[in-house]
Amino acid sequence: MEVSPEEYYRHLYPYDQLVRLLTQNGDELPNIEFAIEGLSPAGDKFYRRYLSVKTAKELKAEVSNFPHVKTFHFGAVYTGKPSGNVRVSAPVRRVLSFDIDLTDKEWIPLKEGGDISLPLCDRAWPVCAASVDLLRRVLELAFGYTQLLVVYSGRRGAHVHVFDEGAMSLSSEGRAAIIGYVNGATGTDKLRSTSGVHLVMKMHNLRKHVRRLFKTLFVVRMGILDTRQARLDFLARLDLEKYASLSDMTDMLIPEVVDKETGKDAWKCIVQHLEGVKQTSPWVLDRLDCAVLAYVWPMLDTNVTRDIAHLTKVPFACHAKTGRVACAVAADELMAFEPGQEAPSLVSWNQDTMDDALLLFDGRKEAMAEAMAEAGISEAERRGEANWELGEQQEQQEDPEDPEDPEDPEVAVLSDSIMAELERKAEAELSEPDMEDLVGPAPRSAVPTNRAPRQALPRKMTFKRKLSPLVPEE
């Protein structure tokens, strides 16, 4: 059965769950901005911004009665009723959001006949899952953020929302500093990652994890080194030919890698050759890291995170092009998640699929997991999928190809100086004239508030505190 967007938002959208999500930290619902997006008969988008509601029922009425509604968004928490006039009401808080879009990875084939292909996007989901996994690790290890909600976008990406109190209270400058830190103050070089990203990886001892993600997901599962051209492209990212001291090694490396039977063998060959020259040229392993990071590390939209007044599409919105619902994804199901099967779709509506997707929102998922455990049924058995969870013993195993970085106290002390520099750059950038529509927060002492004491985010919406590997070690 096909469902129209109007029917979905009138009868099927979970407004009560959304309101509970956005007010769980004690924020007043009337002070949260909502914006509704419609589509005219001519195909032009139009919006209603600064919408304020008192209840979930009122929000449902506003969205349902909006002409030709396509989706709706939530924005910042204001000092009073949301307004475009900062003298009336100014934005002071917002969920810290990150946007991961597969189109930012130039090596992923997403188009077919000139248009974005949904099956190709589905096939590339592991890339998105790896980006989410690394992002949440950095957010916890660097900033202590653990109250995260991951939402599948409906086509080619994911949104990560942080509900920690400290994250929600950040100014636009603070948000810019965080996105700059995660991005490593990235440049425009798409062939390899910047030294900033490499430093972030080393500071948090993520090299082994990054290598494991690349080998298991990208090389073995996705086959990114299966073809001759793909291997030559990867070697080009290393750019080793211009170093005369490595000429003997590169002369052997290229033909050997090209002739390997599988992508996994090609990857092993590359690692072995570079390990062989690390005594005389230790920097080559850093260059390999940067090439790998270009595939694995998340590439994030700065504007989505930086602007405290930015609008964010609500969880469980329907995607205008695919008809899929932007459903939440549990941290321990990132790799097992299959968008084509598990995301509810307006094109062929199945209420059971929607009910399953809502389990993460309304608290039934945890109860069901406990009941299954008592019955001796594993989640992998229920889903009929591979279980990617690891036990404590597996996590302690060493991968001989990817030795873990030792703790480096000299690297760790660089964190404060990097953050200070990123904040300085962010403040300079935000003072530019073309950012005049970016509204900073009012001083906290001048902001009247009746917010209730902070409530902890329900466990069902958060990542597990323990950061377990996303893929198994071999």
Predicted regions and their residues:
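Long, charge-rich alpha-helical interaction segments
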Residues: 182-291
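Intrinsically disordered, low-complexity segments used as extracellular stalks/linkers
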Residues: 394-410
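Catalytic micro-motifs at enzyme active sites that drive phosphoryl/nucleotidyl and oxygen chemistry
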Residues: 82-88, 136-140, 144-152
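Residues forming anionic-ligand binding surfaces in small-molecule and nucleic-acid pockets
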Residues: 87-120, 185, 190, 194-200, ...
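Long, low-complexity intrinsically disordered regions
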Residues: 405-474
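Histidine-centered divalent-metal-coordination microenvironment in nucleic-acid enzymes
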Residues: 95-98, 140, 147-173, 313-314
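SsDNA-processing nucleotidyl-transfer enzymes
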Residues: 2-117, 302-304, 320, 324, ...
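Long, well-ordered alpha-helical scaffolding segments within enzyme catalytic domains
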Residues: 119-145, 291
